Amino acid sequence: MPRRRVVAKREILPDPKHGSQILAKFINHVMVSGKKSVAESIVYNALNTVAARAKTEEPMAIFEKALESIQPMVEVKSRRVGGATYQVPVEVRPARRAALSMRWLVDASRKRGEKSMALRLAGEILDAAENKGSAVKKREDVHRMAEANKAFSHYRF
């Protein structure tokens, strides 16, 4: 953390196809070893698959609904008090909420069994939009952990 001035947030350019900043950020999360064109093709193919499977809704709406269903409201942070380490529940900032949901969606997709990453990602997006799947389970686990440690919430940061 800088001591003098606050570092300005960098502006993320919207993705070329849908014009969405959220999707551009998500493409960056999917990207491995700087291969952005590969990540873009994976995400766009996944959205095309989502559009084919769910004919009624717009694929971007399903994607945003999926991210919304994964976002955690509270998480636990370790706080050391007199030799004991407590897991203290804290509220999650909106920017971190979005980043965690994207990270969990990509991680859950990578662990799935479908053939290509685009199919895995599409499957996980559809599952998350219906409040099921590994990414939603991860959010539930984080919430459960925060609920279990509610007694330590007075050790605020």
UniProtKB/Swiss-Prot annotation:
For this protein, the record's SUPFAM superfamilies field holds: Ribosomal protein S7 (SSF47973)
tRNA-binding recorded as keyword:
yes
Q: What does this protein do?
A: One of the primary rRNA binding proteins, it binds directly to 16S rRNA where it nucleates assembly of the head domain of the 30S subunit. Is located at the subunit interface close to the decoding center, probably blocks exit of the E-site tRNA.
Protein keywords: Ribonucleoprotein, Ribosomal protein, RNA-binding, rRNA-binding, tRNA-binding
One GO cellular-component annotation of the UniProt record comes to: small ribosomal subunit
The molecular function GO annotations come to:
rRNA binding; structural constituent of ribosome; tRNA binding
Write down the InterPro entries for this protein, in alphabetical order.
Ribosomal_uS7, Ribosomal_uS7_bac/org-type, Ribosomal_uS7_CS, Ribosomal_uS7_dom, Ribosomal_uS7_dom_sf
The reply to whether Plastid figures as a keyword in the UniProt entry is no
Similarity comment: Belongs to the universal ribosomal protein uS7 family.
Q: Extract one GO BP annotation from the record.
A: translation
Where does this protein come from, organism-wise? Marinomonas sp. (strain MWYL1)
Q: What is the lineage of its organism?
A: Bacteria, Pseudomonadati, Pseudomonadota, Gammaproteobacteria, Oceanospirillales
Which PANTHER family does this chain map to?
Answer: RIBOSOMAL PROTEIN S7 (PTHR11205)
Q: How does it assemble?
A: Part of the 30S ribosomal subunit. Contacts proteins S9 and S11.
So which domain of life are we looking at? Bacteria
User: What is this protein identified as?
Assistant: Small ribosomal subunit protein uS7
